[in-house]
Each structure stands twice: as structure tokens, then as C-alpha cells.
Amino acid sequence: MQVENHKEEAPFAHYAELFRDLNPAAVTARLSDVRWDGKEFTLGLLGRAFAIAHPDYAIRALDGGALPPLPSQTFLLRYLLESKDVVWQGQWKTFREMPWGEMYIKPYTGRVLTRAAFTFGTRLPAFRAACEKMQALPMKHGDAGYQFDLIGGYRMQILVWEGDDEFPPNAQVLYSDNFAEGFAAEDRVVAGDILISTIKSQM
């Protein structure tokens, strides 16, 4: 594979190669939301279902729509390779409250929280319309807030506050507590990035 956008394509190529050696039975034993029919895995991401061929990676959207961007495809590969079912205890956590959160908080803040604040906090009506289009669950927190089923049993909330003359817009992203055990810190960053990008694509 000729790598042009190294930041996105090199990680994808790496995990696509690891994916070739994946044991499908081991995946479905770890992840109850994933189906395997002998040729393809089927799984959902933010309300859309995708089929991923194995061992030679190929992805298709079951709704016939656009394929997810490469970072989302890499996230799906890492999910199949590394994640597992973890029961949600009903609590919500910030990124900082989870393992390694303190170490990654600076890049996370810029890549997720600041981006969400200035992308959505200045356009609340469009943000609400996009989230409702994605059939997200409205929250009573923030000036606007919604809950999403990301993948499997993992859920996320995004809360946005509109800016004014005194304060800039603000945002917070909350994760269902099972993220702490089910995903590495870098994957939690990517999950936030994917959520923001997907909402933005609907605005």
C-alpha cells in the first residue's frame, strides 16, 4: 500500500495486516455485538452497520451509504483486534478520570473538547438538528447535550455550552464507565474525534 497521508494510512495499513491473522471465533467470543458469517464481520458504529471482509480487509456500509473515513476504519479494526465486552455500571466518566487520562489530557483537550466547543457552541441549532438526525438521546445538561451509542455496549455523551461576550463556548464529553477497561486511552481520544466528526458531517 502506497502511503500518501502517513498520519492516517500508516496506522490503518499496520492494523489491516494484523487483522489478516485474526481468529474470527476469538472475536465473537470477546465481542457479543459482532457477527461472523464465515466471510464478513458485521458490527455497528454510531447507528450505522458495516460489514468487514476477512482475512483480506474490505468494508461496506449495509445502508449503501458512504464508507467511514480512514480513522474510523482504523478504530473499527482496533476494536475487532483488541476490545472486549465490559458491563456498564451506569456511571459516566470524563476522559481525565479514566486510566492514563492525565497523561493524554493536553492532546485530548485540543483534539476533542476545544474542537467540540468551537464547532458546536457557535452553532447550537445546527448541532441539535444533527444530533436529532442521528437519533441521539437528548440530555438536560449543558445548553445542548446528547447521548450516543458508539459501538457495542459503549456510550458517549456530548454537552455543549454556547459562548457569550464574557465566556467562550465550552464542551464536555462523557464516557460510559466501561470505556476505562474496554479501550486504551488513545482509542478514547479517537472515539471523541469520531463522534465530533460524525456530528459535524450531519450539520
Regions found by a protein language model. Give the residues of each.
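Short Lys/Arg-enriched alpha/beta "domain-start" segment
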Residues: 1-39, 72, 79-134
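Amphipathic, interaction-prone secondary-structure segments
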Residues: 27-55, 137-162
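Intrinsically disordered, low-complexity regulatory segments enriched in Ser/Thr/Pro
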Residues: 48-74, 161-186
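Domain-length accessory/inserted modules outside core catalytic folds
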Residues: 50, 104-112, 116, 141-142, ...
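Short, charged/polar micro-motifs that form catalytic or ligand-binding hotspots
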Residues: 62, 66, 117, 144, ...
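Short amphipathic C-terminal alpha-helix that caps PH/PH-like domains
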Residues: 76, 80, 192-195
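Conserved binding-pocket/active-site segment within a compact domain
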Residues: 121-181
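A recognition module on extended beta-rich or small alphabeta surfaces enriched in W/G with H and D/E
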Residues: 176-203
